[in-house]
Amino acid sequence: MNLIFAAKSLLVTRAATGDSWHLPDSSQLQALSYQSSLIQPEGINILGSISSDVDLSPFPELSLVNLRQALNFFGIEMVEKIIHAEQMLFYQNTHRYCGSCGQPTSLSASGKWLHCSSCEHEIYPRISPAMIVAITRGDKLLMAQANHFAPEMWSVLAGFCEVGESLEQTVHREVFEEVGIKIKNVQYWGSQYWPFPNSLMIAFTAEYDSGEIVLDTNEMRAAGFFSKDEIPGRPSTHLSIASRLIDDFIAKH
């Protein structure tokens, strides 16, 4: 598996026939200048990065595709490897210098982490816990549009955990802050690592308890309860845990 990233885009090649996309083979990358990863995840042959404004005109078979879109091209096992590899590159690119003493970092003896040889500070990848919740009110699901969503995109509510909070506290706080309602019967549903930017998504289900929807307009464009036949839009990536929560609601109603 050969993975070349440019920020949050993935280098892919179009199949000879049809509209499917594949990862480039080694021969297609021989003449391409890229920066190799210090860390080499298992199962990855080539891992590297290029500039987002790189000139790919000498390589007509290659294209940069937004990572969210690219994840729709592959099965779940490959998606997990792609996410892991991209996050290891992100980790290296954002931890080039020690946060303790300011000296350049280098690869640890294990080959898996970065460390500072000057002050012996160990630097590990940042993982940001975030909740995501499917809230039902009878046979309807709460769906919302964040201000940064594309017009056709809707999803369930999500938000990052704050220092000192339990996950359950995060669920209640984020829901009330974003749409102004109270919920009950919060139950763990599942989890997924998601590289936007470095989130461990912890999914829950919950039931509406009280209140009327009042949007935090700094974050939300719209929100409402919808039956399975009224769902106004979907997340952009079908393998995301947000999509799977919506699919679970549809299957049960």
Features from the language model and the residues they span:
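Active-site proximal loops enriched in glycine and acidic residues that flank catalytic Cys/His/Asp
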Residues: 145-146, 158, 187-192, 217, ...
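The catalytic Nudix box helix
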Residues: 155-190, 204, 212
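Cys/His-rich short segments
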Residues: 83-136
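Nucleotide phosphate-binding site architecture
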Residues: 142, 162, 232
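Active-site-adjacent beta-strand/loop module that shapes the phosphate/pyrophosphate-binding cleft
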Residues: 192-215
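N-terminal strand-loop-strand
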Residues: 113-155, 182-183, 206-208
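Nudix hydrolase/Nudix homology domain
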Residues: 1-93, 150-154, 196, 216-253
